[in-house]
Amino acid sequence: MRALYPGSFDPVTFGHLDLIQRASQLFDEVIVAVLRNPNKQPSFSLEERLEQLSSVTSHLPQVRVTSFEGLTVHFALEQDARVILRGLRALSDFEFELQLAHTNASLSGQVDTLFMATAVPHSFLSSSVVKEVARFGGDVQHLVPETVAIDLRRLFNQRVDVGGDR
């Protein structure tokens, strides 16, 4: 069975990566799809986010990274994905995600939503939090893969040393 994990991934975090790795053990294929949202100004370009995701998932043969625009449920149907994966960090995530799941079900009864609880070490983690920490010079190496930490330091014009040391 094929699953779709959509998101902005701006940037990809260890929370995202944990969910991708666990999903890859449950499904034959996991499509990690970066949403091209014309109404948002991401910190990283679509190409940068695709490269970040491809790099950190290259060791997972059943993971495919791509992008899409439009309704997630329509893209899931185009990709023959029967499941949309969503990570839940807290109860507050559940209410919003449940509304989306019900909306998707009303648009297509052929695609289910599967909620996966975020692993405890990543339960506080969001891309917004990571960018805020990085913006003010905080260490994000425990929050994102090393290549993404380097990208964040470059984004915020901070010194980048070889080997990830600051």
UniProtKB/Swiss-Prot annotation:
UniProt family annotation: Belongs to the bacterial CoaD family.
Site (Transition state stabilizer): 16
Binding, ATP: 8-9, 16, 87-89, 97, 122-128
Gene Ontology, cellular component aspect: cytoplasm
Cofactor(s) needed for function: Mg(2+)
Entry-linked Pfam families: CTP_transf_like (PF01467)
Subcellular location: Cytoplasm
Entry protein name: Phosphopantetheine adenylyltransferase
InterPro entries xref list: Cyt_trans-like (IPR004821), PPAT (IPR001980), Rossmann-like_a/b/a_fold (IPR014729)
Keyword Cytoplasm tagged: yes
Role of this protein: Reversibly transfers an adenylyl group from ATP to 4'-phosphopantetheine, yielding dephospho-CoA (dPCoA) and pyrophosphate.
Keywords attached to this entry: ATP-binding, Coenzyme A biosynthesis, Cytoplasm, Magnesium, Nucleotide-binding, Nucleotidyltransferase, Transferase
CDD domains: PPAT
Principal subcellular localisation of the protein: cytoplasm
One GO BP annotation of this record: coenzyme A biosynthetic process
Keyword Nucleotidyltransferase: yes
Reactions the enzyme catalyzes: (R)-4'-phosphopantetheine + ATP + H(+) = 3'-dephospho-CoA + diphosphate
Metabolic or biological pathway: Cofactor biosynthesis; coenzyme A biosynthesis; CoA from (R)-pantothenate: step 4/5
PANTHER family, A to Z: PHOSPHOPANTETHEINE ADENYLYLTRANSFERASE
